[in-house]
């Protein structure tokens, strides 16, 4: 059985790669304050409760720019969106809601995929800052405050994203019924595709 895919998308420098690293529990993605560091899709395993899924980090989406590298990054993000079962849309509390955020939100709504709106860089604990409520204007429902640096709020977004993923306990029961012959076939098949990721 293939794992469900969850894509992390957003404009440049909102903390997507930091969040990716925090959620997979290791530093796989390079993190810098310079836009364009992440250019291709990067995959990592993520586990939460009874769910095991592939998390995909993407480069920053710049909807209105068509130069070579930025266009490539946008195409890679679109591929991640197309293959994902659910999407984490990361925004930045400090920058507030931007025109780029609104453009990306519209693109995600057109995809028809379930989206969890993540408002990153909420680094203090306690009552959510009033600026958080501005993110309702994106039309994607409840904004989830997160600090990808400190890990605050990551459990909440994982809980929410798992609501959109198939219940893997049922799949485990189905896997138990696979015969030895078909298990060997599946095992060989997955060994051949693991290197492609």
Where do the protein language model's features map onto the residues?
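Canonical P-loop GTPase G-domain recognition
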Residues: 124-172
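Conserved C-terminal guanine-recognition region of P-loop GTPase G domains, centered on the G4
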Residues: 78-141
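Switch I (G2) and immediately adjacent beta-strands of P-loop GTPase domains
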Residues: 33-65, 79-86
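A conserved segment at the C-terminal end of the G1
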Residues: 17-28, 195-197
